[in-house]
Amino acid sequence: MAATPAPAVGKVLELLGKAAAAAAAAMGIKETVKDRPGTRAREADCSEVSDDADCDQCLLINGRIGPPPTPRYIAKSNRINYDYQLYVANLHAGPERFGYVRAGDNSNSIVNIELSMLKDFFGTGGKYTTLEWMFGGVAFDGFWRSRCTVVEAKGRFGHFFDENGDGKKRFMDDIPVQWVQSFTKQRSVVQVTDPDGRLEWHFMDVNAYQAGKNAGIPEEVARLTPFAIGRIL
């Protein structure tokens, strides 16, 4: 076999050195990124790969599932909003599963609240909360690992707005303002996971969907997702 000229050997060694440095840097990012904003993700769609390790390119997986830091007082009067939240959260979730848990239970054990609804859902509630996805210190209603997407859900709000998305009473116009504040906070932590990380807001009612868009929820983020009552995936 012919000997490789010295300049070619030097070039090969230089390329190998650069490749090793790049691999080490990539490994360093993989080991140190844990719920930290500021590092850009690389493209990876977990629905198209066979090796779970390849899904590590989605930085949103560095969040965690658990009860939200702010208590959720779930009662009979507002339960549909949380049923819808869990419906949206589980539409494309996996292996994560979002459900109801007992307030204060740190084991994240999902419970069937139908069994306790009659005795526990009278009054102001407060005995149950929901599992959500925490990333960058911000809570999201759900996480779709296969799509590298975090989601927010807005349930029965349509009766507050007319068909144009305007509040039926003046104070009702404050609701979309609060939505935009929440969206802005969520977007700030999702942006650092570009280009893979995505945020979607799902609305059960068309009037609320219109109100959200009027207030500033971007068209590419807002989704009208009707709910078949009683369906929690």
Give names to the regions the model predicted.
Residues T70-P71, N78, W144, G165-K168:
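Alpha-helix initiation/capping motif
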Residues T124-G125, F143-R145, V192-P195:
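Flexible, charged surface loops at secondary-structure boundaries
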Residues M1-A22, V180, T184-L233:
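Active-site or metal-binding loop neighborhoods of secreted/extracellular toxin and effector enzymes
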Residues F140-W144, C148-E163, Q186:
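Conserved catalytic cores of phosphodiester-cleaving nucleases, focusing on short active-site segments
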Residues A3-V138:
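Acidic-basic catalytic patches of nuclease active cores, encompassing PD-(D/E)XK
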Residues R156-V177:
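A solvent-exposed, charged loop/short amphipathic helix patch at secondary-structure junctions
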Residues T130, D174, Q178, E200:
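Conserved aromatic-histidine-acidic binding/catalytic patches
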Residues M134, Q178-Q181:
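Short secondary-structure boundary/capping elements
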